[in-house]
Structures are given as C-alpha cells and as structure tokens.
C-alpha cells in the first residue's frame, strides 16, 4: 500500500492559465517530497483544466477535478475533505513558493504540538521583484498581520475536529476563517520565514473589484461575523479589536479612494456606530509594544487617521482624498 503523503497542498484554480504552471512547478520542485497536490478547477473558462490534466498525466501526486463555479470558499472546503495528508497547506494559483517551503513548515509543525504554524510572505510583481515583505515576529499580534490562509500549515485533525471551514462570503472568507482558527487553539505559532511569493496580479479579483466600495460586500455583516467568532473569555480580544480598527481603516481608504466623499463619510459613520454599539473600540495605541512588529506604513496610516478625526478634519480629508 502506498504511504499517505505528509502534506496535502490545496490549490483552487479559476481562469489561471497564465500563471498556473509557475505555481504547480514551484510545488513539484520542492526539496520535501512527501506531498500531494489537490488542484480543483472552479469552472474556469480558459485552459486551466487542460493544463491540470497535462500535469496529472506525468505526476502521480497530483489530483485534479473540475466542476461548475462555486467560489474559492467552497473549493477550499472541498480540498480539505479530499486531503489525505496529515497536514494541509493552501496556495493560490497565481502565487508560488520557494524550493524549501514545504520542508521548513513540515519541520516546524511535526516537531511539536502546534495546530498551525504561520509564516510571512513577500509581495512580488510580474518581474519577480519584491514590493514588500511581511516578516512575522514571535509576539501574539504577528498572526493578525496576515489573515490569508496561505503561507501557513495546518494540522488536518485540528481543522476537522473543530469543523473549521471557509464561509461563503466573497472577499471576506479568508479573514473570517483565519480569525476563527485563532480562537480555537492556543497552539498556534508564528515563524520569521518568508517563502511564499504573493503575486501582485493587476487582473485578479482583489485588484479589480475594489474600485470604490464593493457593493457585493456588506461590511456590517462581516463585522457581525467577526464579533460572533470571539469567545467571551478569549485572551486576545484586545488584539482582535485592534485588528478591526486596522481592517476597517483599510476598507475605508481602499474603497473610499474612488468613491464620493459623501459615501466615504456614510461608510465611516456606519462602521464607527457599529464599533460603539458592539463595544469593539480599540484601546491600543499604534505605539503599544504588543503591536511593535506591525509595518511602519500601517502604523503611520492609523496614526494619521486618528489625528484627522481628533482635530475634526474628517470632512475636509474626504473631500481631498475621494475621487468619485
């Protein structure tokens, strides 16, 4: 009987023909060999599934399937159910990993009792140039700096025993899944390794949909879901409150840039009303030692926005910032 793979690498695929080979090759060329690839074509309209079938013909550790489009959340959940490995990793089809990636994560998680080990990542462009990197420290805040399900390894038993799955909320499934994971175990560790290459694809959903506030994402619904995730006795509630502050600021600045000033102010009021009503106001300063490893540019944006609010210049800021 063939020995089961140690790691199942789940790759959701949708219209990824331009970069799919790079992604798969980066997995096949790993120094660590005990793995399987579960590549699920999510109703692609290009040659993605044809490419997957070509790989499957010569690589016995690749499993592929294709069906109608159901979204990334459904596809990842399907991958978890199909996984034969003791450990699970996710890779997006336009990203790629360094040759020692699986080995590093396997060595980290197999040597202890961790339910998940989280690494950093680097943002790269078409030419492979690093735009920036997110290198994690050992502090508790580090795992909140990146909420992607990628650049980390999970113990499958932990996911199954806790019935952890991705919710069907487009553009928020990663955030909600990761925050739920964080509340289910104290055995989650961060490492400074950055072997995941997060490709800046100008044509991807995350870079094309966010031109103005996305009408398909109800920010209050997402915030309600976050609040529902947090146990009453959760020791990291203050970190999640700070995360909400960071997340909502990103939502306002990203969506507000190409929106009207009136819509920006409406969204701002809606978010801050929710934070006040639900007792989610963060008391952590951007200078607090607990978040010392956060990127400087993130801290600067949060500090500047706080100052604008305090001196009563929000309306002027919206008028100058918003281009809608």
What are these model-predicted stretches?
Residues 1-219, 231-232:
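Nucleotide-sugar donor-binding/catalytic module of glycosyltransferases
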Residues 152, 245-246, 309, 317:
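Polar/charged side chains located within well-ordered beta-strands of beta-rich proteins
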Residues 169-177, 225-228, 246-255, 284-304:
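A short, terminal or domain-edge coil/loop segment
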Residues 195-202, 208-237, 242, 246-279:
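Catalytic core of nucleotide-sugar-dependent glycosyltransferases
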Residues 259-324:
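Membrane-interface aromatic/basic loop that binds lipid-linked glycans or pyrophosphate carriers
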């Amino acid at each position: 009987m063939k020995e089961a793979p140690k790691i199942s690498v789940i790759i959701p695929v949708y219209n990824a023909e331009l970069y799919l080979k790079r992604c798969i090759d980066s997995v096949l060329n790993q120094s660590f060999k005990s793995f399987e690839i579960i590549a699920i074509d999510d109703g692609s309209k290009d040659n993605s599934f044809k490419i997957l079938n070509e790989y499957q013909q010569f690589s016995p550790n690749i499993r592929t399937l294709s069906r109608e489009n159901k979204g990334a959340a459904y596809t990842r959940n399907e991958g978890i159910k199909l996984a034969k490995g003791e450990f699970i990793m996710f890779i997006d089809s336009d990203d790629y990993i360094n040759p020692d990636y699986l080995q590093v994560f396997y060595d980290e998680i197999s040597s202890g009792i961790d339910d998940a080990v989280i690494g950093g990542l680097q943002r790269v462009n078409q030419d492979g140039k690093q735009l920036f990197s997110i290198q994690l420290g050992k502090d508790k805040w580090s795992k909140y700096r990146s909420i992607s399900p990628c650049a980390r390894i999970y113990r499958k038993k932990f996911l199954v025993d806790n019935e952890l799955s991705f919710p069907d909320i487009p553009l928020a499934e990663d955030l909600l899944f990761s925050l739920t994971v964080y509340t289910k175990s104290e055995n989650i560790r961060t490492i400074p390794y950055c072997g995941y290459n997060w490709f800046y694809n100008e044509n991807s959903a995350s870079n094309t949909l966010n031109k103005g506030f996305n009408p398909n994402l109800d920010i209050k619904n997402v915030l309600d879901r976050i609040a529902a995730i947090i146990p009453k006795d959760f020791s990291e509630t203050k970190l999640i409150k700070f995360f909400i502050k960071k997340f909502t600021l990103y939502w306002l600045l990203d969506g507000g840039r190409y929106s009207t000033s009136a819509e920006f102010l409406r969204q701002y009021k809606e978010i801050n009303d929710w934070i006040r009503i639900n007792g989610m106001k963060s008391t952590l300063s951007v200078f607090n030692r607990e978040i010392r490893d956060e990127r400087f540019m993130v801290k600067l944006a949060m500090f500047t926005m706080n100052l604008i609010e305090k001196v009563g210049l929000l309306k002027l800021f919206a008028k100058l910032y918003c281009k809608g």
